[in-house]
């Protein structure tokens, strides 16, 4: 099986996009994703149609799929200008298990409680884990992506950098349309073709998506997240989820014999992980992602934050200090676009503006001295 994140644009792209100083979102606004004429793409599509037909795609489906499709140069720009984000676990968890993400997750757990309990009963995957995946993948449906999937995948396949992979996803998208699960207009997602509340790529959709509502369609694009949540549980279940076993937790706080004890950041908490931790990594092959999902699920369920401290960073500032620095900068008129304690481009720009306005050396770097200078 192709891991649904083999094409990943970085560590938890949707998650990072939601960060105060996060990266560009995994899906650009539709207004920026406008098709432009491209003779090369036209020729590629003409040839692809024959290949799609040879794999059982009807002419009607092909015609419907490409009726409004086009070449999207912004997709190529994003694919060629990816940045691999290497955040510390502390920063990652500050985003993944932020107060807002926890409280919203708890609201969603309550709102969809009955159906989530049914999903948990059928697939054996903790409902809090399913909600946590939803929270990290699309911010509980707020960032599902609005890029036309057929246009995005055909553009990427034509470009050729990972042409074979994206063509396989495009064929899978054609099969989804042919099955009647959605329409070309409704088949939207990220610029890389990940779709729905929990960001399934087309091949994973074909293999794992389920119709939990019983309406005859596996509708992961609907405002109703039921099919998406059930599909995520089905995916994790088939990946080997062990019913009733924890994903892990801070060492010394979970019972049972873990398969490993990790300490991704020193100083920082030691994380005891069980088999279900590896199952989460089948969704996104990253230790930080799996810890983020697991810890967020625990917090949604009412669990406590990790006890062990990460300590100050290289600048001498703790997470609490960095949040306070962002608040003070914003209060002084230098907006950091929020206060999550993660130092990124917005905070660096605010620091630079403050330094410039006050006759200081412009570095954009946080420091204990800067925090003190900003006062209370």
Labelled PLM ranges:
Residues 317-322, 330-376:
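Short acidic, glycine/serine/threonine-rich helix-capping segments at coil-helix boundaries
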Residues 2-25:
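N-terminal export signals
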Residues 184, 188-283, 288-290:
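Flexible, glycine-rich surface segments
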Residues 19-39, 63, 310, 328-331, ...:
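Compositionally biased, proline/threonine/alanine/serine-rich low-complexity intrinsically disordered stretches
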Residues 20-120:
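An acidic, Gly/Ser/Thr/Pro-rich helix-cap/linker signature
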Residues 274-290, 295-341:
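Acidic, Ser/Thr/Pro/Gly-enriched interdomain connector segments
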Residues 90-230:
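Acidic/His-rich structured neighborhood in mature extracellular/periplasmic domains
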């Amino acid at each position: 099986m192709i891991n649904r994140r083999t094409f990943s644009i970085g560590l938890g792209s949707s998650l990072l996009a939601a960060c105060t100083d996060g990266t560009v979102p995994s899906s650009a606004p539709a207004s920026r994703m406008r098709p432009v004429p491209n003779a090369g793409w036209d020729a590629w599509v003409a040839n692809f149609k024959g290949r799609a037909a040879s794999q059982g795609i009807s002419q009607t489906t092909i015609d419907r799929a490409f009726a409004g499709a086009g070449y999207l140069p912004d997709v190529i720009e994003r694919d060629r200008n990816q940045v691999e984000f290497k955040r510390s676990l502390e920063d990652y968890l500050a985003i993944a298990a932020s107060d807002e993400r926890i409280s919203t997750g708890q609201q969603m757990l309550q709102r969809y409680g009955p159906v989530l309990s049914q999903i948990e009963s059928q697939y054996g995957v903790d409902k809090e884990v399913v909600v946590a995946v939803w929270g990290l993948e699309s911010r509980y449906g707020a960032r599902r992506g609005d890029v036309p999937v057929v246009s995005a995948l055909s553009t990427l396949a034509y470009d050729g950098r990972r042409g074979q992979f994206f063509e396989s996803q495009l064929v899978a998208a054609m099969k989804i349309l042919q099955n009647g699960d959605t329409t070309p207009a409704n088949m939207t997602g990220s610029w890389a073709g990940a779709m729905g509340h929990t960001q399934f790529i087309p091949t994973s959709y074909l293999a794992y998506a389920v119709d939990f509502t019983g309406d005859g369609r596996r509708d992961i694009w609907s405002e109703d997240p039921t099919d998406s949540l059930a599909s995520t549980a089905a995916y994790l279940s088939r990946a080997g989820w062990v019913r009733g076993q924890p994903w892990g937790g801070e060492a010394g706080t979970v019972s049972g014999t873990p398969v490993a004890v990790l300490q991704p950041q020193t100083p920082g908490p030691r994380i005891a992980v069980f088999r279900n931790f590896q199952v989460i990594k089948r969704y996104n092959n990253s230790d930080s992602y799996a810890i983020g999902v697991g810890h967020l699920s625990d917090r949604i369920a009412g669990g406590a934050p990790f006890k062990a401290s990460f300590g100050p960073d290289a600048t001498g500032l703790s997470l609490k200090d960095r949040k306070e620095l962002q608040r003070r900068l914003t209060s002084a008129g230098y907006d950091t676009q929020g206060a999550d304690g993660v130092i990124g481009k917005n905070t660096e720009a605010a620091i630079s503006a403050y330094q410039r306005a006050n006759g200081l050396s412009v570095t954009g770097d946080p420091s204990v001295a800067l925090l003190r200078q900003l006062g209370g």
